[in-house]
Structures are given as C-alpha cells and as structure tokens.
Amino acid sequence: MRVWFWLWLLLSVPAKGETIRLYDYHQHPPFNTGVDAGLSRELVKYLNEKLGGEPRIELWLVNRARLALEMSDPAFNGLVAWVNPAWMGDPQRERYLWSFPIMRDTNELISNSEHPITYRGPDSLKGLVFGGVEGYRYQGIDDAAGRGELVRQDAKRVKTNLDLLVRGRIDVTLVSGSSLSFFIDSEHYRGKLFISPFPQSSYTRHILLPKSRADLHGRLNDIAEQMDKDPRWHKVLESYRGTP
C-alpha cells in the first residue's frame, strides 16, 4: 500500500518545465545598466510572460569569446539576444534560425572633438586607428583593416574605447545609437567627443536560435511581431533611451 502511495505522490507532482538560456554579450547600457537592471532583463521578462513559462527563459551574461565557445558545441541549445546575422557569420541565415527584428539600431561614428571626423563612407577612415571591442565584427571596418587601409585596435569594453579616444590613443570608434546617450551625456565625456552627423551603418537586432529549435522559432516570431506593435514594449524601449 505504501508503494502505491509514493507512486501516486510522484505522479501527482507537476513536471518541471524546460529552461533555456538566453545569452547576451552586450555588457553595456541600455542592455545591462547595473545589477539586475537593463533592457536584456526586460526582454527576458517580456518573453517569459508571452511564452507562459513554457519554456522558461533565463538570462546568461557572457563575453563574446565565451559565447563563441558555447556556440562551438554541436549540442548548443541556447538563444542569443540582440544580434544580427552578419555579426554571427551567418549573412545568408543558413547556419541558425533568426527571429523577426526586435530592435532597429545604428552604429554611430565617434571621434575626439579636437579632431572631428565626419563619416561619408569607408574612405573617411583611411589611415586612422579604429577602436573596436574584442570579438565584435564590424561591417566595412574589418574589410578595410584587412586591406591595410586602417588599423583596428581592440579593447574589452565600449567605455574603454571612449577613454582612449579622449586621450588621443585612437582616432575613431563606433557606439550603437541605442547606447549613445548613456555615454555622451556623462559629465566625463561632455564636450570631448564628436558624433558624426551620418551613422556608419544601420541594422536590425534579432534573437538567434539553433536549427534544433524550430519548435520555438515560430512562437518567437509571433512574439517579435507583437512587440513591434505593443505600446507597453515601446514604453520599455523609450525608458532606456537616456541616462538612467
């Protein structure tokens, strides 16, 4: 009798749903603005609400190198937030599944205010030292560096490049339009940086899924489509357009 009781008890306990990691390597505003704060956490909250907890999405903050290591595993089963196919070696969208856009963004060219650079095309950067972030890919920039038309010098963080720019150690860097005001409005940089009136590029941000998650792909696309029309989500985005 006792055996049947324990068997009934075991079967009556609800099975724990699947948890999937949402990787994010953007360790700067607006995506991460402090402990347990930032747009990435808002995204996780929104996705979990729309998915009804099945599966449950869990945020994992990593650097670009760690993400590359995780994704090199053939059994990789996570999602990656805020990325573009061109950055992930998948311009034709053949290696991974991609959600509809969840954000539209730009790359803004920043230079020292004492030596302002206006971006009018790749030739604007010839002979300059460009400050990049380790592991990041830059359309147009990387090709020019490969041809020897400019020098790419990497740092670990966006903020480090802005500090190097102020000190004259590099000539230009790129900051995403979504992040720009978080840095430029800082007292530390005020009046010291020049923003080109023309962005270096514009692009869309997506959620990457492995090919094995076709079951989730359609659901995330439905959510991404809703996000674009959801006033509540637009209000969240708007709240991260300036300095916290």
Language model region names:
Residues 55-56, 136-147, 225-244:
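Ligand-binding clefts/hinges and TM-proximal coupling segments of bilobed small-molecule sensing domains
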Residues 58-125, 138, 197-199:
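Acidic, polar ligand-binding/catalytic clefts
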Residues 27-46, 113-147, 178:
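Bilobed "Venus flytrap"/periplasmic-binding protein-like clamshell domains
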Residues 17-91, 132, 154-155:
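Extracytoplasmic small-molecule ligand-binding "clamshell" domains
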Residues 41-50, 113-116, 128-129, 207-240:
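Extended ligand-binding regions for polar small-molecule ligands
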Residues 58, 65-78, 158-179, 186:
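Short helices/loops that flank or line small-molecule/ion binding pockets
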Residues 24-27, 103-108, 185-224, 243-244:
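Periplasmic-binding protein-like
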Residues 79-92, 171-201:
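A ligand-binding cleft/hinge motif common to bilobed small-molecule-binding domains
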